[in-house]
Every structure is written in structure tokens, then in C-alpha cells.
Curated annotation (Swiss-Prot):
Keywords from the UniProt entry: Membrane, Transmembrane, Transmembrane helix
Matches recorded under CDD domains: TFP_LU_ECD_C9orf57
Protein topology in the membrane: Single-pass membrane protein
Ranges that cross the membrane: 30-50
Official protein name in the record: Uncharacterized protein C9orf57
A Gene Ontology term for the protein's cellular component: membrane
Lineage of origin: Eukaryota, Metazoa, Chordata, Craniata, Vertebrata
Subcellular location: Membrane
InterPro entries: DUF4723
Length: 161
């Protein structure tokens, strides 16, 4: 019996009853792309047939009855925000404080510190007032190092996650 060797990288899957499937990387990527294309075409077909994405006409309403939109937590007097004292890119939150509750008129914020064009860390929490939102400052540190601090605010529960 002649042994066939496969050159290059292969992905192999072991199935039940000792079956084994081997695929080259390009075939595996093709399977994934074909699957994604099928999902996109299915959504497009739904838009063409039903005129919208999401619910495909299964929700029946009576005449004069309107669909209620989702109620967010801030609609009842406040919203919940993620609180993190130190969040690093590719590592996530290192000093997690859990959550904080913003009062009505306050927002969730994410303060990003950028140095040399690279995001170093970010701080997440609740604002005290709207003057903290959407500002960008350039801080001059020792040895002529400049740090850019930008603040982004949002008003949905856990939107700064």
C-alpha cells in the first residue's frame, strides 16, 4: 500500500466512528466564505420578499394597535454604565469597578488616552455633567511628550462596555 503525503498545512477533523476529514486552509476558508454568502443572500431575499430585515411578518397587530419600542433603563430615572479604572487594548479591563448608576441627565463615558498615535489605556464610568462629554484635550507632559485625551459619551445602558 502506497502512503500519500500531503504537503502544506491541513486542518483535520476527527468525527465519530474513526472518520477523519482533512482540508487545506484555502478549502476551509472557502467553506466559511460560502456559508457567509448564504447568510447574506438569505437576508437579501428576506428584504426583497418582506421589505425589511429582522421579523419576517410573524408579529400580528390589531388595527389601531402600535408596536412599542424597547424601554431602556434610563427611561425610568437613570442608566447603568460600566466602571473601569484601567482598560488596556487587547487585554480588557484590569481594574474593574463593576457598574455605576448615572442619574437622569448624566451619561456613560469612555475616556481614551492616546500617546504617539497609539491608544495606551482608557477609563470608563459615569459623568457628573454634560461638560465632560465629547471633549478632546492635548496634555503636554515632561520631556515634551504629548498625550491626547478624548472623551466619548453615550446614553444607553452598558453602552460603554
Amino acid at each position: 500500500m502506497k502512503k500519500i503525503e500531503i504537503s502544506g498545512t491541513c486542518l483535520s477533523f476527527h468525527l465519530l466512528f474513526g472518520l477523519e476529514i482533512r482540508m487545506r486552509r484555502i478549502v476551509f476558508a472557502g467553506v466559511i466564505l460560502f456559508r457567509l454568502l448564504g447568510v447574506i443572500l438569505f437576508r437579501l431575499l428576506g428584504v426583497i420578499l418582506f421589505g425589511r430585515l429582522g421579523d419576517l411578518g410573524t408579529c400580528q397587530t390589531k388595527p389601531g394597535q402600535y408596536w412599542k419600542e424597547e424601554v431602556h433603563i434610563q427611561d425610568v430615572g437613570g442608566l447603568i454604565c460600566r466602571a473601569c479604572n484601567l482598560s488596556l487594548p487587547f487585554h480588557g479591563c484590569l481594574l474593574d469597578l463593576g457598574t455605576c448608576q448615572a442619574e437622569p441627565g448624566q451619561y456613560c463615558k469612555e475616556e481614551v488616552h492616546i500617546q504617539g498615535g497609539i491608544q495606551w489605556y482608557s477609563v470608563k464610568g459615569c459623568t457628573k455633567n454634560t461638560s465632560e462629554c465629547f471633549k478632546s484635550t492635548l496634555v503636554k507632559r515632561i520631556l515634551q511628550l504629548h498625550e491626547l485625551v478624548t472623551t466619548h459619551c453615550c446614553n444607553h445602558s452598558l453602552c460603554n462596555f
